Amino acid sequence: MAFRSAGTLMTEFNAAFVPPALMPGYKGHVPGVASSFGSSYGNTTFKYFQDLRNTGLEKSYALLSGGCFPTIFSPNSPLVLTDNSQNWDRWLHQPTYSRSNQDNGRTTELTNFYKTVQQQRKYYQDKTGILSRVPYFVLPVKEPDRYPLPTDLPPLSEKSKWNLLRLSPDYKRTYQTFPSGKRVSSQERQRRDLYFEFRA
């Protein structure tokens, strides 16, 4: 409500006076648009934008190429009808025929691939580990990486080699130690075995 004590403008022409409480608030400035009481601010600015867009689009396309863009604000009625048909009846204008020159083998291949993709998706989403992997999506690995040979070990140090050789069952010492502490070489034992072999 407007009061004189608030410093509002008072005039003798009642038709020109609009109380400040009834005036629309400031909602931004659009040049050339006067916001009236008959239409809302959104409709006025939207119509201004559409008119500006129509004038720009009429200058943007060449004759006999491209044509007009369908819009709801246009003096041309076919453009408005085209826009309505594209928005409302777009499913009615979908083609009802199907291609008869499709490659059936390729179609079957794509269908099977889609099924395998869904199986792999279920495998990824499985938290229990019941589902198995799809072999189609298993990346190939070289045979040595999958089945490593036990001999392909890192090289051993000299001390480790000596310990392994000493503890192996194939290791034969080249001498024999008697209780007296005397060591006899293997060649001398062979000569003794030849001599004492034929004793009665």
UniProtKB/Swiss-Prot annotation:
Quaternary structure and partners: Microtubule inner protein component of sperm flagellar doublet microtubules.
Subcellular location: Cytoplasm, Cytoskeleton, Cilium axoneme; Cytoplasm, Cytoskeleton, Flagellum axoneme
Family: Belongs to the CIMIP2 family.
A GO CC term assigned to this protein in UniProt: sperm flagellum
PANTHER family, per the entry: PROTEIN FAM166C (PTHR34924:SF1), UPF0573 PROTEIN C2ORF70 (PTHR34924)
Keyword Cytoplasm found: yes
Keyword terms, alphabetized: Cell projection, Cilium, Cytoplasm, Cytoskeleton, Flagellum
Recorded superkingdom: Eukaryota
One GO term of the biological process aspect: flagellated sperm motility
Organism ancestry: Eukaryota, Metazoa, Chordata, Craniata, Vertebrata
Tagged with keyword Cytoplasm: yes
Name recorded for this polypeptide: Ciliary microtubule inner protein 2C
Known role: Microtubule inner protein (MIP) part of the dynein-decorated doublet microtubules (DMTs) in cilia axoneme, which is required for motile cilia beating. Binds to the intra-tubulin interfaces.
Protein's organism: Mus musculus (Mouse)
